[in-house]
UniProtKB/Swiss-Prot annotation:
GO molecular function per UniProt: DNA-binding transcription factor activity, RNA polymerase II-specific; RNA polymerase II cis-regulatory region sequence-specific DNA binding
Family that this chain belongs to: Belongs to the Antp homeobox family.
DNA-binding region(s), chain positions: 8-67
Keywords noted in UniProt: Developmental protein, DNA-binding, Homeobox, Nucleus
Pfam families in the record: Homeodomain
UniProt-listed PROSITE patterns: HOMEOBOX_1, HOMEOBOX_2
Domain of life: Eukaryota
GO biological process: anterior/posterior pattern specification
PANTHER family, per database record: HOMEOBOX PROTEIN ABDOMINAL-A, HOMEOBOX PROTEIN HOX
Cell compartments where the protein resides: Nucleus
Name of the protein described by the UniProt record: Homeobox protein H90
Length: 74
């Protein structure tokens, strides 16, 4: 019956200003990361690879929306 117990949802990750600044800086140079670079950033910022991957996915979507708005396409 353990399969009936719902799994707890992960809490929302909050990033420090330093982490956000470093991630934004990296995004400015590269919108896509290699696995090696993702590992390096994760170690440097004390985050998991998964957190870095998801942050970049979310940031690319934000960038895409901002560019669509700037060019006037929906």
């Amino acid at each position: 019956l353990s399969h009936c117990v719902p799994e707890r949802k992960r809490g929302r990750q909050t990033y420090t200003r330093y982490q956000t600044l470093e991630l934004e800086k990296e995004f400015h140079y590269n919108r896509y990361l290699t696995r090696r670079r993702r590992i390096e950033i994760a170690h440097a910022l004390c985050l998991t690879e998964r957190q870095i991957k998801i942050w970049f996915q979310n940031r690319r979507m934000k960038w895409k929306k901002e560019n669509a708005r700037a060019t006037g396409t929906p």
